[in-house]
């Protein structure tokens, strides 16, 4: 038996999320990968992912793993899957790893990027990949708010509504914001995230950028542990799973890069 780790990228616009769903719910990343790999490995394949992205969310660096008794050379897997996957899902890398390696247990953190287009007139070329916010945003206030969210906190206020109870205490290592030509990219690096947490962070930062809430309110909002204290969840299309970290060296390098911006 062999254990294979994949790096997978996808445009989530027309996908029903990562996790496999009934066929009538639409194409999912997990479902499409299992179908393609079962064909090229000539046996039923079950795949495990590191992050269950929602419908409409994109990924540049999703991590998956599967076990197979098939003999296909690992370096051939990315090319072999092309004919069997939708055009919006691509396997960019495949490597053989120890049998006990699991995607959700052998990583040190994740980076998400949420993109906003902040101009009155929409950009039709990018609307699949950002949230269009027409009113001018105070980016400096958003940066200050990002810094206030860094650290280890109970993020119950920023979780999705009506979600399964899980440990709400997470650590955000860094939040950075880049602004160029109307595009605002919010990078969030942490040890893990609650359902809708990054999109709710983006929504909160936009509310602060619009003056609806203030940076000074953040400690109070977190202490309330009440999802109803913040505004709407930012739309899915602006979110990208940018990277998943296998090593602390790479994690620390990205954190330092964000903090130096």
Protein language model annotation of sequence segments:
Residues 1-261:
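Structured-RNA-binding interfaces characteristic of tRNA pseudouridine synthases
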């Amino acid at each position: 038996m062999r254990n294979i780790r994949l790096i997978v990228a996808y445009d989530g616009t027309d996908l029903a999320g990562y996790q496999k769903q009934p066929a009538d719910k639409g194409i999912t990343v997990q479902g499409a990968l299992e179908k393609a790999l079962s064909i090229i490995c000539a046996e039923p394949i079950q795949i495990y992912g590191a992050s269950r992205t929602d419908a409409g969310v994109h990924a540049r660096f999703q991590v998956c793993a599967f076990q197979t008794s098939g003999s296909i050379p690992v370096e051939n897997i990315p090319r072999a899957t092309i004919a069997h996957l939708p055009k919006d899902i691509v396997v960019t890398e495949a490597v053989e790893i120890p049998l006990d390696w699991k995607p959700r247990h052998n990583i040190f953190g994740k980076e998400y990027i949420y993109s906003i287009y902040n101009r009155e007139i929409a950009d039709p070329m990018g609307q699949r990949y950002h949230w269009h916010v027409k009113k001018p945003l105070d980016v400096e206030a958003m940066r200050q708010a990002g810094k206030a969210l860094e650290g280890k906190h109970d993020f119950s206020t920023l979780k999705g509504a009506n979600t399964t109870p899980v440990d709400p205490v997470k650590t955000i290592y860094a939040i950075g914001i880049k602004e160029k030509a109307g595009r605002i990219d919010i990078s969030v690096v942490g040890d893990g995230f609650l359902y809708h947490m990054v999109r709710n962070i983006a929504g909160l930062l936009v509310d602060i950028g619009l003056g609806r809430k203030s940076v000074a309110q953040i400690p109070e909002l977190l202490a309330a542990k009440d999802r109803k204290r913040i505004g709407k969840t930012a739309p899915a299309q602006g979110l990208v799973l940018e990277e998943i970290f296998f090593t602390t060296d790479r994690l620390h390098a990205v954190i330092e890069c964000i903090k130096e911006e």
